[in-house]
Amino acid sequence: ALINATHMLCCGEDLGMVPACVPDVMHRLQILSLEIQRMPKDPNVAFAHPANAPYLSVCTTGTHDMNPLRAWWEEDRAVTQRFYNEQMGWQGEAPREMTPEIAEFIINQHMYSPAMWVILPLQEWLAIDGKIRIPDQHADRINVPADPHHFWNYRMHITLEELLQKDEYNAHVRRLTAVR
């Protein structure tokens, strides 16, 4: 009924424990799946690669209920190291903090995804610039479902007017998005 009531695309939040029939039903109804690199649908892999996302999907770095990439990077050192070596293909020890170069690399992985849509949280875009991003990466978190005092209280630390004045940054973002 929902699909027939609108001309809008539908996207299903098919994350976590979903019945085995869900992917086939979504595909048959052309409902876009949600593909998150840190939440692979295949239980045999640690990470999903954006290059493997199906066309009928929205590829993103996370949801409002997850840590943004910079905070996630510091959650579990072993997981970060594995991601750095396996998903990024970089050798050596992963930096303790996510650098703008790492954030940009991950964004690029998503931008080249075959997914119909790539929708990235603003926090990830700000992470590519060491001067613009917020110093406290944990302040970028939108929602913590387990904490009734931390819900939807994210506020961007820079105004839109200020961001629009960052010509070099905006040109950089335009170059990154030009591949889509």
Regions found by a protein language model. Give the residues of each.
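Catalytic cores of glycan-processing enzymes that make or break glycosidic bonds
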Residues: 1-180
